Curated annotation (Swiss-Prot):
<dbReference type="GO" id="GO:0004425">
    <property type="term" value="F:indole-3-glycerol-phosphate synthase activity"/>
</dbReference>
<dbReference type="InterPro" id="IPR013798">
    <property type="entry name" value="Indole-3-glycerol_P_synth_dom"/>
</dbReference>
<comment type="similarity">
    <text>Belongs to the TrpC family.</text>
</comment>
<dbReference type="Pfam" id="PF00218">
    <property type="entry name" value="IGPS"/>
</dbReference>
<dbReference type="InterPro" id="IPR011060">
    <property type="entry name" value="RibuloseP-bd_barrel"/>
</dbReference>
<dbReference type="GO" id="GO:0004640">
    <property type="term" value="F:phosphoribosylanthranilate isomerase activity"/>
</dbReference>
<dbReference type="InterPro" id="IPR045186">
    <property type="entry name" value="Indole-3-glycerol_P_synth"/>
</dbReference>
<comment type="pathway">
    <text>Amino-acid biosynthesis; L-tryptophan biosynthesis; L-tryptophan from chorismate: step 4/5.</text>
</comment>
<keyword id="KW-0210">Decarboxylase</keyword>
<keyword id="KW-0028">Amino-acid biosynthesis</keyword>
<dbReference type="GO" id="GO:0000162">
    <property type="term" value="P:L-tryptophan biosynthetic process"/>
</dbReference>
<protein>
    <recommendedName>
        <fullName>Indole-3-glycerol phosphate synthase</fullName>
        <ecNumber>4.1.1.48</ecNumber>
    </recommendedName>
</protein>
<keyword id="KW-0456">Lyase</keyword>
<dbReference type="InterPro" id="IPR013785">
    <property type="entry name" value="Aldolase_TIM"/>
</dbReference>
<dbReference type="InterPro" id="IPR001468">
    <property type="entry name" value="Indole-3-GlycerolPSynthase_CS"/>
</dbReference>
<keyword id="KW-0057">Aromatic amino acid biosynthesis</keyword>
<keyword id="KW-0822">Tryptophan biosynthesis</keyword>
């Protein structure tokens, strides 16, 4: 059984037991606008399929350390591999706009993103069939959320770029079948997309030169998780790099 197949099985089990989400009480923010010309999306990520990253940093402490230099937050809500929780969303929302990251296969998860206060929701293109991915993205848009549609190759990126509505393409440096990361491959996809659609680059970025490269390719931002979880103060340097790049564009 490959990773994505196993993911779907665990999500189906979760959906069978999760309670309905609360009614939304937090304001809805335009996630794309919050990124400005180029944003740092700081992710709260306690673990990954490769193992535990950090358990001694509670969400409120992480967000308090990085919010000054981050444009938005990404929050993992998947509990099995990422030790995530929907309850982290409103904590993040107290500081910045929020992207909910999970393995979304059902509209109920989008309703949860909305109910707990997220402004954007991740939809992984390879996790579901094409028509299902489009349906989920459209449903998110109807609720006022920004769908961030995650891809890892040029062909899928070009396909998603033809979809209607307000969305962001998330170029993932990680191959979800092998879990291998290749940042240079993500940059190649970004070059093919430049000017066609709003996009961000995700996974595996940690160095200032990688952030500068993403900015020079006219990404709307970068999503950084592991590097900032291990060293939250890095966000200041990355923000400074981004601002210098924006000034040169």
């Amino acid at each position: 059984m490959d990773f994505l197949t196993e993911v779907k099985r665990t999500v189906e089990l979760r959906l069978a037991t999760e309670p309905p989400p609360p009614a939304r009480s937090l304001p809805l923010v335009d996630f794309i606008k919050s990124l400005g010309e180029f944003g740092i999306i700081a992710e709260y990520k306690r673990a990954s399929p490769r193992g535990v990253i950090r358990l001694d940093l509670p969400p409120w402490a992480y967000f308090a350390q990085v919010y000054q230099y981050a444009s938005a937050f990404s929050v993992l809500t998947e509990p099995f591999w990422f030790l995530g929780d929907y309850r982290f969303i409103p904590i993040a929302k107290a500081f910045k706009p929020v992207l909910m990251k999970d393995f979304v296969i059902d509209k109920r998860q989008i309703e949860a993103a909305y109910g707990y206060g997220a402004d954007a929701v991740l939809i992984i293109y390879r996790l579901v069939e094409r028509e299902r991915a489009m349906e989920l993205a459209e449903y998110a848009q109807r609720l006022g959320l920004t769908p961030v549609v995650e891809i890892d190759n040029v062909q899928d990126a070009k396909e998603v770029a033809t979809w209607g509505g307000r969305l962001v393409i998330g170029i993932n440096s990680r191959d979800l079948k092998t879990l291998e990361t290749n940042v240079q491959r993500a940059f190649e996809v970004a070059k093919a997309l430049r000017g066609d659609v709003e996009f961000i680059i995700e996974s595996g970025l940690s160095r200032p030169e990688e952030v500068e490269r993403a900015c020079s390719l006219y990404a709307r931002g970068v999503l950084i998780g592991t590097a900032l979880m291990k060293n939250p103060v890095l966000v200041k340097e990355l923000r400074q790099v981004a601002e210098r790049c924006i000034a040169r564009r």
